[in-house]
Amino acid sequence: MLSDTICAIASGQINQAISIIRISGPNAFKIMEKIFLGKVGRSMEITFGWIHDDNQKIDQVLVLWFAGNKNFVGEDTVEINAHGGVLNTNLILELILKTKLARLANPGEFSLRAFLNGKIDLVKAQAINDLIHAEVKVQHQAALNQFLGKSSNFIKNLIEKIEEIIGIIEVNIDYPEYDDVEILTSDVLLPRINQLLADFDQLIKIANNSRLIYQGIKTCLVGAPNSGKSSLLNILINENKAIISEIPGTTRDVVEGNFVLDGLLFKLFDTAGIRKTTEKIEQIGIEKSYESIKKADLILHIIDASEKNRQNLDLKAKTRPDQIYLKIYNKSDLLENQEEFKDEILISAKYQKIENLLEKIKSIFAFLGKNKEFVANSFQISQIELGKLAILDAKTSLESGFGPEIAIVDLRIAWKELKTIFGRVDDENLLDSIFSKFCLGK
């Protein structure tokens, strides 16, 4: 994989002031000798000159050459800074490919090479991708913490604890006569296994909060028809996306939109009004409403406060313990007396008076902003959970009467699952899957 030369537009396919075309691999310098009028300077120096095709000038550019190990990728790399028109940039890329000394890079292949060349570990590689795709400040900070290695320390501490136990067991097995190492019997080992499980549980609990940061907080707006769900969605996303009508059952499909509150990304789903109906299309919409409730992190149950005979929808009974459920009483502008709702969240979507709702949501999710150190993406959370399962298997072995020499097999599996987070990956297909989600030219 590392023996050939790759190239790509690193700055995206858009019109811009300056575009960057990146070439990396053993033929990078040879390619520049063919297409650059002038001499490429020494490593880390910028050279000014023309890109040409058989002496036909294409563009006047700045060329920066990074020798060998003195760059992000870890191999000879050239970056061409050209005028940023899409056509102009692609003409230069086509010219590079025309030399037949390089091929077009796959998405994320520069980062993959940096990983394979030992310039970054897998955590940093994924952090770069997360940094690029960050939509809000909290996501940006989480990705930056990953890149700086702050999150890695939590996992590395677990790895070290497992390594220590494995090391002692191996000495007990291979050198039973060695007196300077404690003897780990099943009775001595079991409390340590339980402590490891507690450490895993704590890490998983914190890591699961990361999903809300990286993927956004899935927020479902539900309630009876004409309760004001669509009006509230339009206010939150600052766009007339959902149809507002006096006719019940207007919203028949799930309408989506995003909004940012206190630096956090909320992904909104406005659902069909829930009521008893014989109308088949409306019934399908209501079924989709219940599906959205199942997927939500935050459920906002919108109720028309002005209705004297309000439909009693027991939606809270359909929620899980890990979901947050809020009752929101709308249409405060139609109330003569608001005393009945003094302890409730009362809003007026019509007049955009929703401050108390926003403050309530901010207070609920304030803890996400406080976790400055440890965050994990879905791949890392999956590996931590696999590690915990292996530790549970070790505990089961010990409780079933097997000795440490059997439990060590599961301890090694747990160790491997955690090491995979940093790049101890034996499956090349897994690597391809991870890096294929990266941007072209990265």
From Swiss-Prot:
Cellular compartments per GO CC: cytosol
Enzyme's top EC category: hydrolase
Binding site for GTP: 226-231, 245-251, 270-273
TrmE-type G domain span: 216-366
SUPFAM superfamilies found in the cross-reference section: Folate-binding domain, P-loop containing nucleoside triphosphate hydrolases, TrmE connector domain
EC nos: 3.6.-.-
Assembly: Homodimer. Heterotetramer of two MnmE and two MnmG subunits.
Alphabetical list of NCBIfam families matching this protein: mnmE_trmE_thdF, small_GTP
Name of the protein in question: tRNA modification GTPase MnmE
Native organism: Mesomycoplasma hyopneumoniae (strain J / ATCC 25934 / NCTC 10110)
Lineage summary: Bacteria, Bacillati, Mycoplasmatota, Mycoplasmoidales, Metamycoplasmataceae
